[in-house]
From Swiss-Prot:
Record keywords: Cell inner membrane, Cell membrane, Heme biosynthesis, Membrane, Transferase, Transmembrane, Transmembrane helix
InterPro entries per record: Protohaem_IX_farnesylTrfase, UbiA_prenyltransferase, UbiA_prenylTrfase_CS, UbiA_sf
Record's miscellaneous remark: Carbon 2 of the heme B porphyrin ring is defined according to the Fischer nomenclature.
GO molecular function annotations of the record: protoheme IX farnesyltransferase activity
Organism whose genome encodes this protein: Klebsiella pneumoniae subsp. pneumoniae (strain ATCC 700721 / MGH 78578)
Protein name: Protoheme IX farnesyltransferase
PANTHER family: PROTOHEME IX FARNESYLTRANSFERASE, MITOCHONDRIAL (PTHR43448:SF2)
Gene that this polypeptide is encoded by: cyoE
Transmembrane segments: 8-28, 35-55, 84-104, 107-127, 132-152, 162-182, 208-228, 233-253, 264-284
Pathways per UniProt: Porphyrin-containing compound metabolism; heme O biosynthesis; heme O from protoheme: step 1/1
GO biological process: heme O biosynthetic process
Length: 295
C-alpha cells in the first residue's frame, strides 16, 4: 500500500522540481546557506508538488485510461480509492503550505499557493482538456518551484525571481511539446488539445524553435543582471545553442517521434545543467551589472 501512495505523488516530478528549487535557493543564498531554511523549503515544496500530482491523478483518471503511458496508474487500476486520494492530497497540501509559511516565509507560501491553484484549478480542471493554450498556462505552475526556492531566501520577488520565472516557464514549452509529439497518439486518443495534435507537428516545431530562442535570451539575463557569473553564462549559452540546433534539425528528420524524444531528453539535461550552475556560480548584484546601465 505504501508503494501505491508513493507512486500517486509522481516521485520523478517531485525530484525534478527539487533540483530547480535547489538552484533558486542557492542562487539567492550566494554562499551563505541557512540549512534549516533549506530543509523546510525543500520539504514544503515537495509536499505541495506531491499534493498537486495526486489531485492531478484524481482529475485525470478518466483520460488516463485512454493513454498507453498512463493506463497503469494507481487510480486507474483502482489500487487507491478516489476518496482516499482526495484526503491524501489535501493533507499533503496543508502540510506543505504550513511548512512554507512557518519554515520559510509567507511569500514562499503564497507563491506555492498560486502555482498550486494554476496547476490544479486552472490547468488540470479546465485548460488541459479544453484549450490549446493549456501548456502555456501549465508552464507558469511548472516555473514556481525555483522561484519559491529563491524567494524563501530573499523574502522578496525581485528581478532575479522574475528572470527565474521566465527561464523555467519558457523551458516548459518545448519540453512539453516534445512530449506531445512523441506521445502524439496518446494525446489524440484522449482528445487532449495539445498544439501538435490541434495545429500539427510542423506548427509545433515552429513554436519549439521560437520558445528555445526566447529561453536562450532569458537564461543570459541572470548573468547580464549580475545574479550569476560567467561560468554560468558559458554553460547557458552552450546548452541553448545545442538545444536550438536540435530543434532546427527537426525540420529535416524522417522520424518526428525519435527526434522529439531526443529533444525532450536534452531539455532535462539543459535545465539540470542551468540549475547546477546557478547554484555554484552566483554573484551579488551591483552597479557593475550590464543591466544597471539601462535602468
Amino acid at each position: 500500500m505504501f508503494k501505491q501512495y508513493l507512486q500517486v505523488t509522481k516521485p520523478g516530478i517531485i525530484f525534478g522540481n527539487l533540483i530547480s528549487v535547489i538552484g533558486g535557493f542557492l542562487l539567492a543564498s550566494k554562499g551563505h546557506i541557512d540549512y534549516p531554511l533549506f530543509v523546510w523549503t525543500l520539504l514544503g515544496v515537495s509536499l505541495v508538488v506531491a499534493s498537486g500530482c495526486v489531485f492531478n491523478n484524481y482529475i485525470d483518471r478518466d483520460i488516463d485510461r485512454k493513454m498507453e503511458r498512463t493506463k497503469n496508474r494507481v487510480l486507474v487500476k483502482g489500487l487507491i480509492s478516489p476518496e482516499a486520494s482526495l484526503v491524501y492530497a489535501t493533507l499533503l497540501g496543508i502540510a506543505g503550505f504550513m511548512l512554507l509559511w512557518f519554515g520559510a516565509n509567507p511569500l514562499a507560501c503564497w507563491l506555492g499557493v498560486m502555482g498550486f491553484v494554476v496547476y490544479v484549478g486552472v490547468y488540470s480542471l479546465y485548460m488541459k482538456r479544453h484549450s490549446v493554450y493549456g501548456t502555456l498556462i501549465g508552464s507558469l505552475s511548472g516555473a514556481a518551484p525555483p522561484v519559491i526556492g529563491y524567494c524563501a531566501v530573499t523574502g522578496d520577488f525581485d528581478s532575479g525571481a522574475a528572470i527565474l520565472l521566465a527561464i523555467f516557464s519558457l523551458w516548459q514549452m518545448p519540453h512539453s511539446y516534445a512530449i506531445a509529439i512523441f506521445r502524439f497518439k496518446d494525446y489524440q486518443a484522449a482528445n487532449i488539445p495539445v498544439l501538435p495534435v490541434v495545429k500539427g507537428i510542423s506548427v509545433a516545431k515552429n513554436h519549439i524553435t521560437l520558445y528555445i530562442v526566447a529561453f536562450a535570451v532569458a537564461t543570459l539575463m541572470l548573468s547580464l543582471g549580475g545574479y550569476a557569473g560567467y561560468k554560468y553564462l558559458v554553460v547557458a549559452a552552450a546548452v541553448s545553442v545545442w538545444w536550438l540546433g536540435m530543434a532546427l534539425r527537426g525540420y529535416k528528420v524522417a522520424d518526428d517521434k525519435v527526434w522529439a524524444r531526443k529533444l525532450f531528453v536534452f531539455s532535462i539535461v539543459a535545465i539540470t545543467a542551468l540549475s547546477v550552475m546557478m547554484s555554484v556560480d552566483f554573484m551579488v548584484p551591483d552597479s557593475h551589472s550590464l543591466l544597471a546601465y539601462v535602468r
